[in-house]
Amino acid sequence: MAHRPRWTLSQVTELFEKPLLDLLFEAQQVHRQHFEPRQVQVSTLLSIKTGACPEDCKYCPQSSRYKTGLEAERLMEVEQVLESARKAKAAGSTRFCMGAAWKNPHERDMPYLEQMVQGVKAMGLEACMTLGTLSESQAQRLANAGLDYYNHNLDTSPEFYGNIITTRTYQERLDTLEKVRDAGIKVCSGGIVGLGETVKDRAGLLLQLANLPTPPESVPINMLVKVKGTPLADNDDVDAFDFIRTIAVARIMMPTSYVRLSAGREQMNEQTQAMCFMAGANSIFYGCKLLTTPNPEEDKDLQLFRKLGLNPQQTAVLAGDNEQQQRLGQALMTPDTDEYYNAAAL
């Protein structure tokens, strides 16, 4: 394998300081070298266990430490999750992501999580989970069950991290990513813009991600969703150009990774989202609620895809599942469709 040079903080800072149009031009050039520029990867996300999390992440309404009005729910039954996955596939989804609000999975929950992964995979869907910290054995068990992707965000730079979270160390997050990678599972890891961090912190976050032994296959860039009752509810709004700039730098630094627009997309107008796609974003969550924060309504997503001439990526799945690719394309590109699965409606 060819040696991959490591990024330095000064190099990343130089990217952030580039004139925006020059930065976008470079990011789009890099993007076109590695991806079909009009294709966007589309995922569906379901919260399989909501609220009552013991962590103190200051941005998160799922923490038991904050009064946000969120009703806690137990881990969903396996069949409930699989029924949701069936609906997702019937409507054209190719990847099904399952998220649970806890610090780490208990051993008693592992058999149920394995059954969820196995059931989703049996449908010909890609399976993704975000469950918090994993042990080496837990990562291997999920890999053996067939898990394709594991999401575990770094959130921000190591230097700013302690201002946001105290119940889980930065190194613990890095260790989980290493265990996931060693188990043979693809890594999904990114962060949040708008926590009160500086541009240097944004550079530091992307530096950590890009300098991993293997960069994440998927890099979600979230815009803070300010939820009443959380400590960050009164944070300043994120400037749209600052967010777009972060997307562009992520694309340049991690040219073969999918850069995903995740939480906060409902706060962006069409023009901001369009510039994010121009900056190299090529993945979204569609037609669902991002755990406990809203995503744009499906019809708005469809309209934007049509306006920009974007198409859902034709993801490689099990043989015989080409029909679901066609259904997703039809749903995204055909006006007035309402058949797409909405996880938030269950």
Swiss-Prot record:
Catalytic activities: (4R,5S)-dethiobiotin + (sulfur carrier)-SH + 2 reduced [2Fe-2S]-[ferredoxin] + 2 S-adenosyl-L-methionine = (sulfur carrier)-H + biotin + 2 5'-deoxyadenosine + 2 L-methionine + 2 oxidized [2Fe-2S]-[ferredoxin]
EC number(s) stated in the UniProt entry for this protein: 2.8.1.6
Highest taxon, organism lineage: Bacteria
Biological process according to GO: biotin biosynthetic process
CC cofactor note: Binds 1 [4Fe-4S] cluster. The cluster is coordinated with 3 cysteines and an exchangeable S-adenosyl-L-methionine.
Single annotated GO MF: iron ion binding
Family as reported in the entry's similarity comment: Belongs to the radical SAM superfamily. Biotin synthase family.
Organism annotation: Shigella flexneri
Protein name, entry field: Biotin synthase
